[in-house]
Amino acid sequence: MLCDSIESFFGALGADRRILGLDFGEKKFGLAVSDSTGTIAMPHSVYLRRNVRQDLGELNAILKREGICAAVVGLPLQLDGMEGEMCAVVRSFVQKLIKKSGVYVYLHDERFTTAMASRTTESLGLRRKASQKVDDKISAALILQQVLDMAKGRGII
């Protein structure tokens, strides 16, 4: 089910709030997972995309293996806040993910998370090539953590 607000998203979840964070890219996905209280987002992995069918199968396997029933997916809005072509691709993929896995999904503005992830890896002293291997999963963790923090700030969790 696609949730249109943080309130409806967290309202649909049970006590165990393990949530997947997904930074959607054309070539790869960055993945993050929250703890069971839905408080802390941790980078999980980077998945190299193959095709939609295999991508959905792999995500569904991760959801089952990790005991996850919900996902926060980054929505790549343009700088002016408008939706571009990539947003339509993300929305289409999310509908297929919901159909296959039955997860609750909340779409969250992901503007600037990749830049924030790059600055984080730079501050850790990682070289560019090494940082490119982790930037996507750090971006996914940032997207997920932003939503967790917003929910906490609103007294939802």
Swiss-Prot record:
Its main location: cytoplasm. GO terms for biological process: rRNA 5'-end processing. One of its GO terms (cellular component) is cytosol. GO terms for molecular function: nuclease activity. It is found in: Cytoplasm. Its EC number is 3.1.-.-. Keywords: Cytoplasm, Hydrolase, Nuclease, Ribosome biogenesis. PANTHER family: POLYNUCLEOTIDYL TRANSFERASE, RIBONUCLEASE H-LIKE SUPERFAMILY PROTEIN. Could be a nuclease involved in processing of the 5'-end of pre-16S rRNA. Belongs to the YqgF nuclease family. This is Putative pre-16S rRNA nuclease. It comes from Anaplasma marginale (strain St. Maries).
